[in-house]
């Protein structure tokens, strides 16, 4: 689902015009609310995320029975983002809470700062330590306002067919680094020539490249906003993808439907992706129960990170009314910063929690029959804690991504020189955005 919506998002966010000039929103102490507070708040979200908030609204109303929570469901993130741009630009019809994908928080908060409440004084003082570390950098704006609270995460793991590995005599524990992955992949395909060792789309979505960059503690921009798409670590990251193709280990699954089909039909032995994929295969491939397992992704070196981030969303308060702001914060706190609500949303809707205390709850750490009674959740929790805090985005992130997707396709499909192509991309981003290229 994430891959299907990425281009609509890029399109809609890219057409958001420059909005209000940056002015720090003066934060005042919010009025106290209790069970007698009577108001109504509107929350915008999409698909299963919207349905999850409808569920947490029910338990929220046990404490605040007179606060009505209206959750408006959009068909997808792209559709929602298009509407966000319209209402924020006009200043009319803005909801009290917006769901925003983590990488796109600054695309809205930087352009329309007066509508984004600074949550720093409301959130726990240790908020940066109790959520997915990869979500911290995307939750603040350039002035240091905490404009969003992390909701769900996409810790990246390697899904693999345990039955195929067993048939080929492959021990998955022998895969520690990317060099191991390539070596074992050749061995696997030598024994099972009709199955590719890995698959992913070579076109349209740069997600796998971004996964490897985050793992390698780099992104398109660094903390200072300088361009790092042509840095040695970015080059190293996409070089791995080219090697997998050049070594004949990779299947181009082209798009979302092709990816589902390849995994369902046994055309690939592994798939490296965010944890939301686990829910996808349970839904789309129930007949494969017991055949899949998950493990940490290969590292760039023996001491390197075996974790990354792919996807996930946040909640932001965009109301200007103090009572509605207070009610909105109470709802966000109830939904995102309590173990019970996060477990509810994960168990019922597959939204993997960004809230780290969930990982220590005994209800979370249970064996998963679909993955051969593996302690799957425990693995995902370990990976999330280890994700490098490498994701830095900006108000012009959509422009950067559009250029990145173009060069990603050129490198993987046209065999273009990697360093030269990324140098050109860095120059193009610099020309388009005025940003400096990191030295």
Model-predicted segments: where are they?
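Long, aromatic- and glycine/proline-rich binding clefts that accommodate carbohydrate-like moieties
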Residues: 35, 137, 295, 346-405, ...
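Extracytoplasmic "Venus flytrap"/periplasmic binding protein-like
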Residues: 59-131, 167-169, 176, 267-270, ...
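Short, well-ordered beta-strand elements
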Residues: 36-48, 67-72, 96-97, 147, ...
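Glycine-centered hinge/linker elements that transmit conformational signals in sensory
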Residues: 184-187, 224-253, 297
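A structural signal for short loop-to-beta-strand junctions that line the ligand-binding cleft
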Residues: 86, 94-98, 125-164, 196, ...
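A bilobed periplasmic-binding-protein/Venus flytrap-type ligand-binding module shared by bacterial periplasmic
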Residues: 159-162, 310-323
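Hinge/lid segment of periplasmic solute-binding proteins
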Residues: 30, 101-157, 182, 212, ...
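Extracytoplasmic/periplasmic solute-binding protein
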Residues: 138, 142-151, 156, 179-226, ...
